[in-house]
Amino acid sequence: MGEEARALDMEEISDNTTRRNDVVHDLMVDLYPLSSYYFGSKEALRVKDEIISDRVIRLKSNYAAHGLRTCVEAVLLVELFKHPHVLLLQYRNSIFKLPGGRLRPGESDIEGLKRKLASKLSVNENVGVSGYEVGECIGMWWRPNFETLMYPFLPPNIKHPKECTKLFLVRLPVHQQFVVPKNFKLLAVPLCQLHENEKTYGPIMSQIPKLLSKFSFNMMEI
């Protein structure tokens, strides 16, 4: 019995060590220099120009047809000046977006995010892009009603929210091509600039530095 107990203890210690190593690996993010990526342009992407009332009408129509609207967005990180930078799409010099968009009915989060990354950042939106490693969901925001702003929690009195936005940490390979529509720019924005800068980047993107605070960054040299 003593030998069996010791063997079981050793097996448990080994399993715990493996789990701890897996956790450390999951919380360590390799960041590659911005200079190791290629940036190009493609045909302009049609963008809906709408006022708030038009957006509310569109949200109501979408909800009536498909129920809860779910959007997925990618947090892509690169290294510049030994500091993490987030890749953001800029439209008309004042509108910033994370790469991503709305899921199709029945589409999974990961499938939809990869499709949106191909649409926004690759030459051919109909061909899947290799290299992106979609990791964990680092944050969720909810729109309780059509006219309201989004919250990082679902109010307890809301049983049928109208929209959910999920942020995923997407790890990049050492090299990647980013081909962006001509009417957009792809900018590398430092975490220190995003931090609580809601006026410029909105309530979601300005919270990204806090969402990433549990991760450690390994600045890779090429």
From Swiss-Prot:
Localization: Nucleus
Disulfide bridge partners, by residue number: none
Chief location category: nucleus
Phylogenetic placement of the source organism: Eukaryota, Viridiplantae, Streptophyta, Embryophyta, Tracheophyta
Protein's name according to its UniProt entry: Pre-mRNA cleavage factor Im 25 kDa subunit 1
Region listing for Interaction with RNA, in residue ranges: 94-96
Gene Ontology MF, one: metal ion binding
Organism in which the protein naturally occurs: Arabidopsis thaliana (Mouse-ear cress)
Zinc is among the record's keywords: no
Family in the record: Belongs to the Nudix hydrolase family. CPSF5 subfamily.
